[in-house]
């Protein structure tokens, strides 16, 4: 809810020129996930326009209401990011007037070898690689070009500590996060001259259904809210 404060101006004072602060536009993919939702809520404030993407429409709508209650404007979209043609069209739409100030490429999925260690199934591996790598590169490359042309912007790519060392229970996930880590680091050097920053975020275990589905211990488990504050 927005609050208005009345200002009394005497005849001896010059009228105050009160202008609306410019909207800061933040795009977050995977906003219905634990980290994505916590990030959206953390950034929600007056003067912020949140563009939220997620696959669960009901959860996305509830998140939008919570963010609006903190004063943010929200725009929601729900589609499968693995449809890269639709993804690139959406990214182009976002940049028609001006590209976002901040893009958080957060969407992703995880698979594992199973409780019995039977191994990952190719169908799941293919879906993971399409979402975690292909869609991330498609989105970031589409918006990075517009930011570069404008001469400003910030991109955050959510990787993982698993990018440093392949976890035996999640080999494909580890490989995908290593890929986007390398991509973000390379992109950072290319875009620096155009005043576009690139941050590669490397969270550890964060409490979520995705994390819970992984077999084995989860040391140093963080809440999504704590992770969002640090990010």
State what each model feature region is.
Residues 160:
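Residue(s) in the substrate-gating loop at a strand-loop-helix junction
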Residues 140, 176:
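Active-site helix of classical SDR
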Residues 110-126, 169:
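Conserved mid-core segment of classical short-chain dehydrogenase/reductases
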